[in-house]
Amino acid sequence: MTKTIYVLNGPNLNLLGTREPDIYGHHTLADVEALCRETAARFGLEAVCHQTNREGEIVDLIHEAAKKQAAGLIINGGGYSHTSVAIHDAIVGVQIPTVEVHVSNVYARERFRHQSFIAKAAFATLCGFGIEGYRLAILGLAARIGLAAKT
């Protein structure tokens, strides 16, 4: 049975490629999802990708990942990263190895972006690498759960 990882993208990430391209670049959400599926497959993993603008739906998807025994979770909570205790608590509650990803370097931006509730629940955070951060997150997650790339 193939192990799965959940890749969750929060609010406004559906606008990748058109929203503030000087900050977020020109790659689209479809590009992110294709990159995640391709990278995960190198480790024998299936990437289950979701995007939602709703906080409660992110919490539900985290619970779903646990129920379906996902091997890991990669999450870009968008603006909810800086505000959502509920998402933090969901990650802590399910105890799935989690990597937080941000396309931009949140620490080089507005001060309110410097705090992340998700980071406090994740074993790692990547930011500022553009969509390449998702690939790096999968590499780190695979190492964390003991998987090597298939040749």
Swiss-Prot record:
Descriptive protein name: 3-dehydroquinate dehydratase
One GO BP: amino acid biosynthetic process
InterPro entries documented for this protein: DHquinase_II (IPR001874), DHquinase_II_CS (IPR018509), DHquinase_II_sf (IPR036441)
EC number: 4.2.1.10
Organism in which the protein naturally occurs: Afipia carboxidovorans (strain ATCC 49405 / DSM 1227 / KCTC 32145 / OM5)
Molecular function via GO: 3-dehydroquinate dehydratase activity
Positions with a binding annotation for substrate: 76, 82, 89, 103-104, 113
Lyase keyword on record: yes
